[in-house]
């Protein structure tokens, strides 16, 4: 799992300096941005320096044990590096269900907030005594909320729901995040318009499962995602809307129709499949079969031939046999999936699968992870070869992390943070980040493409 650190905005000296570290997924990042906005609006100032901060807020991740270990490591680093008078506020998924793993470090914590309880960040910071408030309250239930974006100015995440209705055997997210809570449609559209007004050109919709949106309040318990998309697409402008985390049983003809008819709803979907063997899928408590998955992927690629499909798979699920794993390898080699995240099964306490017999050894899981990763890499190389010589419209994200002589860009088939990018090595025509250009693909290295800027994209 990719765990990232987000630091925010250095401003002038103040006795009320705050420093945020946000770990885990983009949904966590949105919560961090809201907390940051609340504090900035209240007169606090943000600093990039951990050592200078008066208040340090760590938003933890608990998706897997590796994520919890990373959260603990960051907390230890903060405790050692902070100045003596600084206070630490701990929040996020880990404190809601795995606080016992933090017990040795709790004496160093000034305040503990439950996952998503962003509303109380101000009271936590201003509390004169050590405190704790573990609740499932989400900012989705609040009214007007400030938010300070930490992403590059041209893209932002828009969370439309919190919690999860699914009960997959390997997952503990429902016990951490609670039941599905959909954000009111009018609030979503208000935030969408505000992001556009701020100059955001790519809005990435996120939830535990976008397709579950509205099932907690609609009379027929059906998804209302199509209503959200239709309302958004009424807004004028040449923006991009990208969908992440859409379960396979929630991708219906209405969603496909919208992608087909309006280029602003990008032909890109992130569909977590997790496996392809029917016995394993059943043990995982997934609601789709291999046959249904193949039918869906065939429909998507028939209706929208240029679509990009992202997915995730788990190797080494309890009881997974060599033959069942080979089914997964064969499926990946068929090239159905463009961008893929692969995880070794993690035995998470509290999940159904944690108590299953026939747990797969770590050595076998590591071997299977390597085999499946290699199969996908071969697919990507074949696909990248076909792209060489083509010209794509792409947005310039910024400098490449390895060198300011290079830039990074993305076309519609590449989501930020999770997918490969285009490495731009000829960019004399670029006048600003966040703008779209026509880029000729000249080669590739690993998963990433290499390209040169031809000219500005039409409309820029």
Swiss-Prot record:
Residues reported in the UniProt entry to bind [4Fe-4S] cluster 2: 164, 168, 171
Superkingdom assignment: Bacteria
Reactions catalysed according to its record: L-aspartate(89)-[ribosomal protein uS12]-hydrogen + (sulfur carrier)-SH + AH2 + 2 S-adenosyl-L-methionine = 3-methylsulfanyl-L-aspartate(89)-[ribosomal protein uS12]-hydrogen + (sulfur carrier)-H + 5'-deoxyadenosine + L-methionine + A + S-adenosyl-L-homocysteine + 2 H(+)
Domain Radical SAM core: 150-382
Organism annotation: Chlamydia felis (strain Fe/C-56) (Chlamydophila felis)
UniProt-listed SMART domains: Elp3 (SM00729)
One of the protein's GO biological processes: tRNA modification
MF terms (GO), sorted A to Z: 4 iron, 4 sulfur cluster binding; aspartic acid methylthiotransferase activity; metal ion binding; protein methylthiotransferase activity
Family: Belongs to the methylthiotransferase family. RimO subfamily.
CDD domains linked: Radical_SAM
EC class: transferase
Transmembrane spans: none
Details of cofactor binding: Binds 2 [4Fe-4S] clusters. One cluster is coordinated with 3 cysteines and an exchangeable S-adenosyl-L-methionine.
Localization terms from the record: Cytoplasm
Protein name per Swiss-Prot or TrEMBL: Ribosomal protein uS12 methylthiotransferase RimO
List of residues binding [4Fe-4S] cluster 1: 25, 61, 93
Residue stretches making up the TRAM domain: 385-455
